[in-house]
Amino acid sequence: MTNSDRKEKLPGYFDSAWPVECGGNRRQKAATGKLLSKNSKTEMISTVSNKWNVMVIQREKNEFFLGGTMPYFNGPKPYGWVQKINSDSLEVLNESPQLPCGDHVWCGAIAAHENGSIIKVNGSFMHVLSPECEVIL
């Protein structure tokens, strides 16, 4: 039987509720806790960025990172990016520079490493960023 990724810390990842896209490598898309929305008022916040927003991950409590890419069909070469966002307002707090993809259009992957850095994969490139979205490697 397959273990549930939400019941134990995922080795290699930052110890948070959602350190990697889809909740883990097995893509179980499940987190611990409750939504507690039964008696709550529904509120939806949205924003338009004109980017291919792919996945949000959590590092520390209330510290969220959005990763994505720019699709390329004709025009400028594609690139990836990471934004540190405010989860209440969706305001961008920090943003990486354009991250090369190697001319390969793929939505990419994002994870919070156990050492605290953010790992972003785009096309044939892997980038390591600080929690302030600065490129380390």
Describe every region a protein language model picked out.
Residues 66, 119-121:
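Conserved beta-strand element within WD40/beta-propeller blades
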Residues 77, 121-123, 130:
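Structural signature of WD-repeat beta-propellers
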Residues 80-83, 125-127:
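A short loop-to-beta-strand structural motif that recurs across blades of beta-propeller domains
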Residues 93-94, 136-137:
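A structural motif specific to WD40 beta-propellers
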